[in-house]
């Protein structure tokens, strides 16, 4: 779950029956104490109001779920943090945690012989799902890519009031249409009249990265204008 998945789960729990799973026992501790440890708008209120549960195993989560949203970190290397001059070479994100999470869901679905939709919401570079994730899926797992456009600290209001929902599916893959319909149903119930932009998985990967780059460039321009104004 983590800092992204937890507030998203709380938001989804306002309209859906939601269970969460995290490798860290900290997730259950938050529910036990009913105290949200991070600065996140509405998180404390929803922690007290919703019926979100956290289970102990991936099997329990898959047994309960029709759709599993995977929210794990895809970090870049520290040298790309921007605290020092950017290196000349380039490197992809680290997808180790993402591969492990999706793999555990696929294995659990196979053990339980239960079809489940896997919807990844993490940020990745174009081509990642085809290269890193598709080989992990099996006959029991349908797949969709639905990355979020949120700001940490405002995850819940951003999640519940999006400009649009980005949905990447590959219709030529078995179960692609079924996976798309599952994601549409979740968001349609949660956010009535929400605008859903559906496209291929590769196009959705590119759209998410370009959106992030565009926002970053706006910040760069704003900072440059501020520097000029100060001079």
Regions found by a protein language model. Name each.
Residues 64-65, 115, 162:
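Local beta-strand N-terminus motif with an aromatic residue
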Residues 76-154:
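Rossmann-like NAD(P)(H) cofactor-binding subdomain of soluble oxidoreductases
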Residues 17-19, 23-67, 71-92, 99, ...:
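Conserved N-terminal Rossmann-fold NAD(P) cofactor-binding segment
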Residues 2-6:
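N-terminal Rossmann-fold NAD(P) dinucleotide-binding loop
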Residues 11-12:
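Aromatic pocket-lining residues of Rossmann-like dinucleotide-binding sites
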Residues 131-146, 150-231:
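Internal alpha-helical scaffold of NAD(P)-dependent oxidoreductase catalytic cores
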Residues 70-72, 122, 169-170:
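Glycine-rich, N-terminal phosphate-binding loop of Rossmann-like dinucleotide-binding domains
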């Amino acid at each position: 779950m983590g800092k992204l998945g937890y507030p998203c789960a709380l938001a989804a729990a306002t309209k859906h029956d939601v269970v969460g799973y995290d490798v860290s026992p900290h997730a259950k501790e938050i529910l036990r104490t009913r105290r949200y440890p991070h600065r996140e708008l509405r998180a404390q209120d929803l922690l007290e109001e919703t019926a979100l549960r956290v289970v102990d195993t991936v099997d329990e989560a898959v047994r309960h779920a029709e759709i599993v949203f995977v929210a794990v970190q895809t970090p870049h290397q520290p040298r790309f943090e921007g605290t020092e001059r950017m290196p000349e070479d380039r490197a992809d994100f680290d997808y180790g945690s993402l591969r492990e999470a999706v793999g555990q869901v696929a294995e659990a679905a196979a053990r339980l012989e239960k079809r489940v939709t896997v919807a990844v919401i993490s940020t990745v570079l174009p081509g990642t799902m085809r290269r890193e994730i598709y080989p992990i899926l099996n006959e029991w797992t349908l797949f969709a890519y639905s990355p979020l456009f949120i700001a940490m600290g405002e995850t819940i209001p951003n999640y519940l009031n999006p400009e649009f929902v980005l949905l990447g599916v590959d219709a030529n893959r078995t179960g692609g249409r079924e996976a798309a319909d599952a994601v549409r149903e979740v968001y349609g119930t949660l956010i009535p009249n929400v605008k859903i932009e559906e496209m291929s998985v590769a196009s959705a990967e590119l759209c998410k990265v370009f959106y992030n780059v565009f926002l970053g460039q706006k910040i760069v321009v704003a900072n440059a204008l501020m520097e000029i104004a100060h001079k």
